Amino acid sequence: MRPLAEYSSTFDLAPETSVPALYEGPIAWAASRRYLDDLALAIAKSGSNLHFMGLGGDELFDYMPGTVRSLWLESAPRALGIIRHLQTSRRIKGRTLLRAALRGDSYQQTLERVSLAMQQRTKADASDRYSWVPPMEIPHWFSDEGRALVIEKFSTIAAHPPAPLGNDPLAQQTIESITFQGGVLRQLSEVYAASGIDWQAPLTDIEVLRAVLRSRASARFHPDNDKPLLAAAVGSAAPHDFYHKRRRGDFTTDVHVEHGKRRRALFDELSESALADLGIVDHAAMRAAVYEPSSTDLGLFDAEHIVTAERWLRSVEQITGRN
């Protein structure tokens, strides 16, 4: 099979024709759809009906934003060393991480504070990025109607929040992320049901999750290895240098290249927009965000989310004949 980047449909508005896929709403893995289509065919042709995936590896064994509080409770001196490492390797202000480590807010208190910042359009405290939930930053290309809708929904949840999934931010985020990946696994089974393939992701197994949650937060960090906890569990089953730290992959570079090739056509294709017709986005601002996203990866994610939602709405309209 060709490299994943050559299949990408990140900025492609070609309609989705699979009814099971449309039932799932705008799927998070839409950009990999063409690759997965070919992968399913290749697996079926090989005579196999079982495919293992690595879903959950990053969530279980890598750094999560809520890690700093757990590190501090485990060992303050060790936490300071890891905070210093994160400050230099991820370019995060040390004072921000330290405030997050010392902050003892409950899940509900965090939701209430984030909700208030959204309502007042004030900038959330930077340390909230490393607490229970990240600050909700409504994109500038949302319309007033769309903004009000998001604030209303979030405020309702903040006023009567469900119980957190975990006892601390790290457990909450780990369980939440694994739950999301489990949802992706279910979607694959639904969308590719006709292939007869049993899609499996062993790292999303409940016993694996429980084992990781029982481990120390510091076990996720090592000066030389990525995912040291997983490396220790795998032991000699993997080559000795398999988990050595490597430079950042080229996935983001691929997305930038794809956007550069598609942005002019995409801008034109969005001259009419199902999202804009719903009134939840500012049409001109949305097109500008797609054509000229911010220079950060987040800007590209914004553009990707716009395309994913727009593609889904157009596909639903095409299949149902409704506007």
Residue ranges and their predicted role:
Residues 1-149, 190-237, 312-323:
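ATP-dependent adenylate-handling active sites, centered on carboxylate activation for C-N bond formation
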Residues 22-36, 169, 193, 283-289, ...:
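Long, Lys/Arg- and hydrophobic-enriched amphipathic alpha-helices
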Residues 38, 175-186, 190, 301-318:
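Short, hydrophobic/amphipathic alpha-helical patches that form generic packing surfaces
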Residues 65, 238-297:
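PAPS-dependent sulfotransferase catalytic core
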Residues 132-173:
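Glycine/proline-rich, flexible active-site/cofactor-binding loop segments
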Residues 163-176, 223-225, 289-306, 316-317:
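Structural motif
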Residues 177-180, 200-204, 258, 299:
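Secondary-structure capping and boundary motifs in well-ordered enzyme cores
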Residues 190, 194-196, 224-227, 244-249, ...:
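Short coil/turn segments at secondary-structure boundaries
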